[in-house]
Amino acid sequence: MSSGDPRSGRQDGAPRAAAALCGLYHEAGQQLQRLKDQLAARDALIASLRTRLAALEGHTAPSLVDALLDQVERFREQLRRQEEGASETQLRQEVERLTERLEEKEREMQQLMSQPQHEQEKEVVLLRRSVAEKEKARAASDVLCRSLADETHQLRRTLAATAHMCQHLAKCLDERQCAQGDAGEKSPAELEQTSSDASGQSVIKKLQEENRLLKQKVTHVEDLNAKWQRYDASRDEYVKGLHAQLKRRQVPLEPELMKKEISRLNRQLEEKISDCAEANQELTAMRMSRDTALERVQMLEQQILAYKDDFKSERADRERAHSRIQELEEKIMSLMYQVSQRQDSREPGPCRIHTGNKTAKYLEMDALEHVTPGGWRPESRSQQMEPSAEGGHVCTAQRGQGDLQCPHCLRCFSDEQGEAFLRHLSECCQ
């Protein structure tokens, strides 16, 4: 059992290192988020300070505020570069290396099981490889610590420059307030200016307080750097312990312990693979649902446009139909009025009767041209008589001099039945 203790310590060290790296990565992300929030609050304070100082109509304060804004923009750009820097990439690479190392250990375990006669030599080679990998991980962590230290120094320099600008701004405001106090009597406008200076000083104090808080945050980052250094020291101790175990290694591992360790690593690998597969399935389902929703939205938009166009065209058709009906009704009323005038002005006699029949015929033809839909026109008198003879209607031959006749069914109406004739005409011609 003493031979299994070094191997268990070596195998438990990799998860501990990965957990430590993940914890430090999350702490760095939270620290960056807090710094972003503080920068947003300070931007708001600077904007309010700029609006208040605009009322002073000075030349020094606006330029200082512009310089302060430039400093804040540079600070924000540095934070953005820090977010997009190499720290996150290095941490991800470290996690990937740990995963690859687990896979390599599994393959080496399988090789050891297949060749039991060289277990001791292969175990020594495996330990040497693990030591080399630890050295590589140490080098990567050193690079990461150096990058974090550089970023910390940059933040401290930026904070110092910002504090210097704030102090200079406060000094200028104090000088202006002293100059205004020595001017003698103060007008109402000067009193307002003094109050605005006091408010500007209060804002500057708030800004200084924010700078103090940012310095505290920088101190916290330095503490994180110290944690990294302690982690490096503990890792060095772990590597030294591995070297000592390698030197003291003389008895090969028992086959049962090796089998248990291989099975445990296989279970871990299967769990990781299943988690990755589930994540890929969820991502695929989300993408498919998003594409389906987008297609549905586009289809609904096209349907809405089509319905809108149909509604507009139908409304235009209805308006044209109503206008056409009104025009036809007006023409029919005018024709009826002309017919009534002609009937009132005619006199009895064979000659007058003949003229009246002819006039009624022309009026009837004119009414048919305006009322009958589909472009139907009576061509001749003989064509009008044919359907009446076939259908048994003989009212055309028996019409009086002022009678009205339907052009569709050849039904006759007297002069007093003008309204009935119009109703029949509208129903028969539909």
UniProtKB/Swiss-Prot annotation:
Span of zinc fingers (CCHC NOA-type): 398-430
Cellular compartments annotated: Cytoplasm
Disordered: annotated segments: 183-202, 373-394
Coiled coil feature spans: 30-139, 198-227, 256-344
Signal peptide: none
Biological-process GO terms, alphabetical: apoptotic process; CD40 signaling pathway; cellular response to lipopolysaccharide; inflammatory response; interleukin-1-mediated signaling pathway; negative regulation of canonical NF-kappaB signal transduction; negative regulation of endothelial cell apoptotic process; positive regulation of B cell activation
Keyword Cell membrane: no
Modified residues (Phosphoserine): S8
PTM summary: In vitro phosphorylated by CHUK. Ubiquitinated; undergoes 'Lys-48'-linked polyubiquitination probably leading to constitutive proteasomal degradation which can be impaired by IKK-A/CHUK or IKBKB probably involving deubiquitination. Deubiquitinated by USP35; leading to stabilization and inhibition of TNFalpha-induced NF-kappa-B activation.
GO cellular component: cytoplasm; cytosol; nucleoplasm
Keywords: Apoptosis, Coiled coil, Cytoplasm, Inflammatory response, Metal-binding, Phosphoprotein, Transcription, Transcription regulation, Ubl conjugation, Zinc, Zinc-finger
GO-annotated molecular function: K63-linked polyubiquitin modification-dependent protein binding; protein kinase binding; zinc ion binding
Tissues with expression: Ubiquitously expressed in all tissues examined.
Region (Ubiquitin-binding domain (UBD)): 290-348
Record field: compositional bias (Polar residues): 192-202
Binding site for Zn(2+): C406, C409, H424, C428
Record's subunit section: Interacts with STK11/LKB1, TNFAIP3, IKBKG, NFKB1, MAP3K8, TEK, RIPK1, CHUK, IKBKB and SMARCD1. Interacts with polyubiquitin.
Function: Inhibits NF-kappa-B activation by blocking the interaction of RIPK1 with its downstream effector NEMO/IKBKG. Forms a ternary complex with NFKB1 and MAP3K8 but appears to function upstream of MAP3K8 in the TLR4 signaling pathway that regulates MAP3K8 activation. Involved in activation of the MEK/ERK signaling pathway during innate immune response; this function seems to be stimulus- and cell type specific. Required for stability of MAP3K8. Involved in regulation of apoptosis in endothelial cells; promotes TEK agonist-stimulated endothelial survival.
Protein name: TNFAIP3-interacting protein 2
Lineage: Eukaryota, Metazoa, Chordata, Craniata, Vertebrata
Gene: Tnip2
